Amino acid sequence: MGVLSNLEPASVFYYFEEICSIPHTSHHEKALSDYCVQFAKAHGLACRQDEMGNVLIKAPATPGYEKEPGLILQGHLDMVGDKTADCPLDLEKDAIHPVVDGGYVCAEGTTLGGDDGIAVAYALAVLDAKDIPHPALEVVLTVCEEVGLLGASAMDFSDLEGRLLLNIDSEEEGVLTAGCAGGRRVECHLPITRAAVTGTAVKADIAGLVGGHSGTEIHKGRANAIALLGRWLTLLTENGVDYAALALSGGAKENVIPKESSITLVLPAGITEAVRAAGADFTAQMKAEFGTADPGIRLQLTEEGCGEYDALDANSAERLRKALLLMPWGVQAMSMDVPGLVETSLNLGVAEMDEQEAILRFSIRSSVPSAKELLSCKLQTLTELLGGSVRFHGDYPAWTYARESALRDRCVAVYEAQYGAKPQIVAIHAGLECGILSGKIEGLDCISFGPNLLHVHTPNERADIASVARVWEYLKAILAYKV
């Protein structure tokens, strides 16, 4: 018996637990993709799998629905793999361990993968059922969504017949998403020169931050652990502390607000009173600025030994400090048309350093193409002023809100019949594959919805069990709707 075997709807949670048992972080979805292909073959369904691992499964209409317009069910196979500092799992190789915690499903020390495993579970449960009426279905399951919507960008959709698409990649029940931001990934490369230096290696860890999804939670005022390193280095400089930078790390994914970062410095005399004073100033300032959104923020200093180290020379260390201090992050502009909607933002998601260079990795989002280009230009200009270079990749278009949508009207009508209330219709500041599919499939009508998922992209992620059940009933009602 599985951990989730007593939950309803049983078929949905059965497949969700199956998905959890198969590692499927971005770029490592092959096993889950193969599982879906074997599922299709076992059920006698037409299926194709491309070289990337994207999967298309086709199911014929049930009796009485042969003349209804076909529907596309769409979600992504990959998940963001994040974990607590003490979690021993390798999420590229190890299974997720789901647990039931009251009215929620969560995971032990890791992200749950409800984004977007719940969509895959819904789709497989529909295809497996014998008692769910529906028109002809095309199930599209993509890879590498979380790292720039790469699977959808590469997938061939020329054989899709449906023009009505249900994207199940939203995280709030009662909300129908009808538009989203476009995005781009940016890598800023700063060359470094190293030189021998003698002193005490001191590691500074910034931790205790909440983190979160860089699209749907970027407006919540949470601190960025990587950007705070620039503040820390600047306070050291202002307190007259000489240092040489030795190592840098922070964050896990470009689209996750980093909750931890560290920098190792070589200090002439270790943790002196001046260093402690800078640490006290840093903690006080950060708590004053971010205490409401990030009450657990903390700085920990640890001496790691004395000796001679191959650290950054003074010029490289200063350019790194300036980059960490000056690179923009967070909300850049709010929409003038939609109250409360973020228009443009960027997330400094990953920092790393090797022997030759420091690399800062960003995720840019905007519903205005020119604003995305301007922010890209700013990052490029600042990086070049600091002697570095940039690489752009993972570009994807915005999904523009349609004034008229027959599918949206259907979903609203079904929602009102089931819930006795009107759904909220929104555009969001996050990337959805609807933008890519709309650009590739002429005349495509899209809507996105899903159950309540909390704290996605973090080890605190949890899925609301009752909401999963209600949205399952909602999905079945949409499938059974006759035009």
Predicted regions and their residues:
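His/Asp/Glu-rich mid-to-C-terminal helical/loop segments that flank catalytic regions of hydrolases
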Residues: 158, 222-239, 267-272, 318-325, ...
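Fold-level recognition of mixed alpha/beta catalytic cores in primary-metabolism enzymes, strongest
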Residues: 135-225, 233, 237
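A conserved active-site cap/scaffold subdomain adjacent to cofactor or substrate pockets
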Residues: 254-330, 334
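Active-site-adjacent substrate-binding region
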Residues: 222-248, 401-444
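Acidic/His- and Gly-rich active-site-bordering loop/insert found
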Residues: 2-104
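A short beta-alpha structural unit
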Residues: 17-21, 264, 298-310, 347-351, ...
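Active-site metal-coordination/substrate-binding segment of hydrolases
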Residues: 65-147, 152-163, 198-201, 314-317, ...
